[in-house]
Amino acid sequence: MSYFETEGNSTCVMTYSHDGFGLGHLRRNTTIASVLARQVPDSSVLMLIGCPSGAVFKLPTGVDFIKLPSVIKRNTGVWLPMRLRIGLEKTKALRVATIQEAVRVFHPQALLVDHVPVGIWGELLPSLQMLKRRSDAPTIVLGLRDILDAPEVTRTLWERDGTYEAIRRYYDEIFIYGHKEIFDTGASYGLDGEFASKLHYLGYVCEQEPYKSQQEMRQELQVENKLVVITGGGGADAFPMMLECMKALQVLGGNSGLEVIFITGPLMEGGQREHLRELAKGLQARVLVHVDDHLSYMNAADLVVTMAGYNSLYQLIRLRKKGLVIPRPGPSAEQQTRARLFAERGLVDVVRPGELSPKRLAEKFMDDLERTDYPLYDPTFDTNGSRKAADRLAEQLTATRVSSTACYRERGQGDTRIYR
């Protein structure tokens, strides 16, 4: 472990993810922050996160986080405190104050905001206003996954909440973590007109850590039969899918010739996880919570079963594994849209919510293990989004440094003004 006793001249970058549901926002920002910390050796990346489990993923030297009070998304635009018994207004005030003070003290040269331009409840607005008033104003970037919701739903919500005006006023660039040829995020969500010059399609943000070969991991897991890995991402909404999968294994019986590993994710409720463990008794099935080497588990599989969340699906496609995808039925159209698009390209197989039953799943498990017609190779599928995002941020940091050479901060008693 490294320790740093001097203040130094670190390049400061801040990221924000509300993390009101799942790990997708946190995973993207963590991956980009890790790449940036390696590419810019003097950088410090401070992540503002809301995940109830903390940072979850390994952080390299140069990356740290501040945990905001946890909230949970109950419906589109509806958020509630998750753990503290202090009421909605106090939770809002505490998050706003924590963010604002972190921004003031850390004094970032770049801010990367994932998914929600003004934060939940508009909690980023005071900090965005403060940053824009600085004479050495940082680069402010909005990062968006490829598919947010049905276009009409997102457009209506953004119009209602003043999101377009906030993007116009505060954001210098918009990173799209996807491919325009596969899904035109800009056109779908009204960002292709006056905002077109800010848009950068960077490809998919996938974990860049090394992973073990299929043979090595299977030996480590002592697997001799066909292996099915069932993963639920963060796990907050994975129980219904995993319960159906467990029932499908019961349909197949203990002599199916399959070995199955469930990775529930750290956000699944404990009672739900224990119920799965009870059902797994007598089957060739293991139920795990969270594994650091998630990619190696997926790579060891003959078939991966997952939902259609951003991280799980794109890691699956990056590994070029057979994947049976069970998209979440709602509340947004994100997962069903993504599953349909990638099934049409021959990259995954899909069981749609209306088709879901233990018998249907059992048939799919066995059929997909024997199929040889997928996944197809798709040359447009670029998984270097984290590197491209880090490269773009590094370019902006260099430009900011050059433009700030005439600036110095005079620190006196109670004085933190910027002079040119």
PLM feature segments, named:
Residues 17-30, 239-240:
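A short, glycine/small-residue-rich beta-strand->loop->alpha-helix junction that serves as a flexible
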Residues 100-169:
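Conserved nucleotide-sugar donor-interacting segment of glycosyltransferase catalytic cores
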Residues 204-303, 336, 354:
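Donor-nucleotide binding loops and adjacent catalytic segments primarily
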Residues 292-337:
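A donor-sugar binding/catalytic signature common to diverse glycosyltransferases
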Residues 363, 368-420:
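C-terminal amphipathic helix plus adjacent low-complexity
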